[in-house]
């Protein structure tokens, strides 16, 4: 009679309208990024900035690169951008007319801004980069290729090498992210670079980071190191040596090696390989590897934790890499033969990890 005498299971907790709304918001999460993309494509932020003061909807419509603009369509888009806290909405003429201006985050949508995120927005939301997210299930098997490779038939690096326009957009996007990050890196970690006589920026893209470091520390002999097709398209960099190559095969010798936003792209085995090459390239007594990457705190309620977890999923889907915890970094560096390391939080999503041979 056991089952008959058992007390009934507690009733399932009732689902609230708030729960449903949360799930709707998640389902339509792509609306945020694609409304943002549309705003960038038609130059809404630039039009607002170039206007003399706040702009009305009619003024905005008149300046769009589109004929016969639907005022209702535009209003609903702008209303959503207001909800996303990208655009500020105010009223004038006794409250009968709405006018719009940019909030601070909206300035990142300006094409000519030093820290513009326009290339990153356009690159990450273009169709090819959206395909991989539909192949997450196929990536679950052990030993499987990435979701990107499942969807596109090649890994992300082969794709970028074979698509110069997308490669340029990717590197411009990274450069925009890099400008803000590098400024913070230099301001918060001057002692990391002072005293160095030479530095190689591995996977340095178009040279934005190494150029800023050289300008801040002109006594350092600086080298940009990346794949041949990337180096060929890098900025003009006076006083900085450019070396094409493959970090999995060799790394130029220097007192210090910089790996900024590199290791999160790769598996642990690949990272150990890269780090061993870096260790071989630096002097045992005075050398170091400077890693700039996320140090993930999985249980933290920090305001940046969700962003860091999103970046981890991005790595999972597109590169096969990961964002790592402090323990992950310790294990990785020990496997690569480094005797010690220290992790320093900075005013950024990433931290600075200095590893000593």
Swiss-Prot record:
The active site is at residue 264. GO terms for molecular function: 3'-hydroxy-N-methyl-(S)-coclaurine 4'-O-methyltransferase activity; O-methyltransferase activity; protein dimerization activity. PANTHER family: O-METHYLTRANSFERASE (PTHR11746). Keywords: Alkaloid metabolism, Methyltransferase, S-adenosyl-L-methionine, Transferase. Involved in the biosynthesis of benzylisoquinoline alkaloids. Catalyzes the transfer of the methyl group to the 4'-hydroxyl group of 3'-hydroxy-N-methylcoclaurine to form reticuline. Can also use laudanosoline and, with a lower activity, 6-O-methylnorlaudanosoline and norlaudanosoline as substrates. Also involved in the papaverine biosynthesis. Belongs to the class I-like SAM-binding methyltransferase superfamily. Cation-independent O-methyltransferase family. COMT subfamily. S-adenosyl-L-methionine binds at residue 226. The keyword S-adenosyl-L-methionine applies. It comes from Papaver somniferum (Opium poppy). This is 3'-hydroxy-N-methyl-(S)-coclaurine 4'-O-methyltransferase 2. Optimum pH is 7.0.
